């Protein structure tokens, strides 16, 4: 039945095509006749002009009118010719549309054969013009796959249904694809490859179509255009959507299986998957959105850390995205499919960070370099690179003390450390911060072991976030560091250390002992009061109340490393223990390490100070920390969360002490003045 209806439809289409071709031929003849008339008119006008020229030179002025008089019939003839050519054009485009309606041809590979078939074209139109017109119509039709644009009434969209009814059989034949790909003609680019596969599968029916026609020129057109019709119908069909969904699900499933074990490889693959989904489906299909939604779910399941990292990335990019889930980041926050693509980029970012963290525990140097290269902030990356060796040393110590089992916990700790900056930015993440604090307390002992690497990464990512956010809460850490050297200038040399914070942190430690003695003299307390008061207010306003709690606990955990950087970040405690009055902070700044250990908010720091230096810090770092303990303003501890990264520089501290000591002394003089 389907065959007979198809055959009847084909006959109708052929008859319509013949009619259109006849009209086209008639229009061509008319155009030829009009052109001949124009030639005759031109000759006549030329003859008249010649006669008038020969008659006398006086009538020459009237030559223009005379030439224009014949020009008026000529102009009319030219207008008629243009009209005829336009009608011819429309007829040809109708013919092409008819062919495409019957065969689903979506672009013009067969346009030239059809022209050739219709004979030589004396018209001024070029093949390119005809093809372009036909193609625009066809593209319109392709963009509206449900109905054919401009299809003549004689060829209703029944052929579609017939074709669809007839094709399911061939469509299930997988092997028929490759052989007739030339006959198919290229599938229009916007259509994804699964549809192409469908169209190729539908090709066998096309062969039968040619036979039924009994050959001839028209069958050539049929075969040339056939496959692309299947592209059109397949593109809209539920079969194609199901197929795309299958493909995507298979890919995601494979990657899920492969990747849940090793995160970095999985992350790389997943990045590929997401992009493939977008390119293949074009981002307009609900399936595509669903798949992309599923991808983040996979991410979520594979690594809880990655989820935190995604939220951190979302907050870094400053987009007000619901932070409950990566999908919230992607689709809700970015607002649409293009936004989803942006979200894909964001996921890539955060996944790279996850990779870096995972690899960072395994290979500290690699992590340092990758973070240097890939971290959005090139400058911070450079700083990170400077401290890679310290990272390696600290991380190895951390790994030894913590063991592999605790590596993951430091990983979470890192995320929590990163989340603490995020907490400052977004009070909403306070829950995460609370969790991170909880896990931080659990990890307290291990973190004390691993606090230095954690602090390192915290500092690195703290810098990343601080500079990325541009928030003064985040910058609170670095602004306090920056502003204290800038405003205080006790640490004139510290401005340079901030340029190379990681290497110079050790130097600062060295110089801190000297400087902090002087600072305790009262200059540091005074200027810490100033900086703490100002930046403390800023950070209090900006929500470092939350951050202060989280970072206070982090300080407690990272106590000694925190002290290491306390010099540059005495103000930071100002904001963060700002639950404490600034006066208390100043007192603490003046107090020796005993005060630091006895601090109420830093009460946790006391055990951590005792524990941390022993397991983790190298012999060099330990004396530095102990020296700094008294010298550093205990109030600065919250910031040094990031400091531990730079403390590890064991060899640097001695040189740094020498270098930064005198520098800071001079700077302190400047600051005193």
Swiss-Prot record:
Residues 4-49, 75-101 form a coiled coil. GO terms for cellular component: cytoplasm; plasma membrane. The modification Cysteine methyl ester is found at residue 670. Residues 327-338 have a biased composition (Gly residues). It comes from Homo sapiens. Pfam families: Paralemmin. This is Paralemmin-3. The modification Phosphothreonine is found at residues 151, 301. One of its GO terms (molecular function) is ATP binding. Residues 392-477, 487-532 have a biased composition (Basic and acidic residues). A lipid is attached at residue 670 (S-farnesyl cysteine). It is found in: Cytoplasm; Cell membrane. It comes from the Eukaryota. Residues 123-137 have a biased composition (Polar residues). A lipid is attached at residues 667, 669 (S-palmitoyl cysteine). Palmitoylated on Cys-667 and Cys-669 and prenylated on Cys-670; which is required for membrane association. ATP-binding protein, which may act as a adapter in the Toll-like receptor (TLR) signaling. PANTHER family: PARALEMMIN-3. It is a lipid-anchor. Residues 671-673 form a propeptide. GO terms for biological process: negative regulation of cytokine-mediated signaling pathway; regulation of cell shape; response to lipopolysaccharide; Toll signaling pathway. Induction: Up-regulated by bacterial lipopolysaccharides (LPS).
């Amino acid at each position: 039945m389907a065959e007979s209806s198809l055959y009847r439809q084909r006959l109708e289409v052929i008859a319509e095509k013949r009619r259109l071709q006849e009209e086209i031929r008639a229009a061509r003849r008319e155009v030829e006749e009009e052109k001949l008339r124009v030639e005759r008119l031109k000759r006549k006008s030329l003859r008249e002009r010649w006669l008038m020229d020969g008659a006398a030179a006086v009538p020459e002025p009237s030559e223009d009118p005379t030439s224009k008089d014949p020009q008026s019939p000529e102009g009319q003839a030219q207008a008629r010719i243009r009209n005829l050519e336009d009608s011819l054009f429309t007829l040809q485009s109708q013919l092409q549309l008819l062919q495409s309606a019957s065969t689903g041809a979506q672009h013009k590979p067969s346009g030239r054969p059809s022209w050739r078939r219709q004979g030589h074209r004396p018209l001024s139109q070029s093949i390119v013009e005809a093809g372009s017109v036909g193609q625009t119509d066809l593209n319109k039709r392709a963009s509206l796959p449900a109905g054919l644009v401009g299809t003549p009434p004689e060829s209703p969209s029944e052929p579609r249904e017939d074709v669809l009814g007839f094709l399911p059989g061939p469509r299930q034949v997988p092997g028929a694809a490759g052989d007739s790909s030339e006959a198919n003609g290229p599938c229009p680019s916007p259509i994804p490859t699964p549809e192409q596969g469908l169209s190729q599968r539908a090709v066998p029916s096309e062969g039968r179509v040619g036979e039924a026609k009994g050959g001839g020129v028209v069958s050539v057109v049929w075969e040339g255009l056939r496959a692309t019709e299947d592209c059109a119908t397949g593109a809209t069909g539920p079969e194609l959507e199901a197929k795309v969904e299958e493909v995507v699900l298979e890919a995601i499933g494979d990657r899920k299986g492969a990747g849940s074990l090793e995160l970095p490889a999985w992350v790389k693959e997943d990045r590929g998957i997401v992009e493939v989904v977008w390119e293949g489906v074009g981002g307009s299909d609900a399936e595509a959105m669903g798949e992309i939604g599923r991808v983040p779910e996979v991410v979520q399941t594979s690594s809880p850390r990655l989820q935190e990292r995604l939220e951190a990335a979302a907050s870094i990019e400053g987009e007000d995205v619901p932070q409950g889930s990566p999908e919230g980041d992607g689709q809700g926050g970015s607002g649409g499919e293009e936004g989803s693509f942006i979200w894909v980029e964001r996921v890539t970012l955060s996944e790279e960070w996850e990779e870096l963290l995972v690899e960072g525990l395994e290979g500290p140097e690699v992590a340092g370099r990758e973070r240097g290269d890939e971290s959005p902030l090139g400058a911070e990356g450079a700083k990170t690179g400077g401290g890679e060796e310290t990272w390696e040393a600290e991380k190895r110590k951390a790994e030894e003390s913590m063991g592999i089992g605790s590596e993951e916990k430091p990983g979470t700790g890192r995320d929590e450390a990163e989340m603490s900056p995020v907490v400052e930015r977004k009070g909403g993440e306070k829950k995460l911060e609370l969790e991170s604090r909880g896990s931080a307390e659990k990890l307290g002992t291990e973190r004390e072991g691993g606090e230095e690497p954690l602090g390192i990464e915290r500092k690195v990512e703290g810098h990343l976030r601080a500079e990325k956010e541009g928030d003064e809460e985040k910058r609170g850490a670095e602004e306090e560091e920056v502003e204290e050297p800038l405003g205080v200038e006790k640490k004139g040399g510290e401005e340079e250390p901030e340029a190379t914070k990681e290497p110079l942190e050790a130097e600062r430690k060295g110089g801190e002992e000297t400087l902090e003695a002087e600072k305790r003299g009262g200059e540091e307390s005074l200027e810490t009061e100033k900086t703490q008061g100002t930046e403390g207010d800023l950070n209090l306003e900006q929500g470092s109340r939350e951050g202060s709690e989280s970072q206070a606990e982090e300080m407690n955990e990272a106590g000694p490393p925190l002290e290491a950087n306390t010099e540059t970040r005495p103000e930071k405690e100002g904001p963060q223990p700002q639950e404490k009055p600034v006066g208390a902070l100043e007192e603490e700044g003046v107090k020796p390490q005993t005060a630091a250990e006895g601090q109420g908010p830093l009460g946790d720091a006391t055990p951590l100070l005792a524990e941390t230096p022993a397991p983790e810090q190298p012999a060099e770092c330990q004396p530095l920390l102990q020296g700094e303990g008294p010298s550093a303003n205990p109030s600065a501890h919250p910031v040094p969360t990031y400091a531990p990264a730079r403390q590890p520089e064991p060899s640097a501290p001695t040189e740094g002490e020498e270098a930064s000591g005198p520098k800071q002394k001079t700077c302190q003089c400047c600051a005193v003045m």
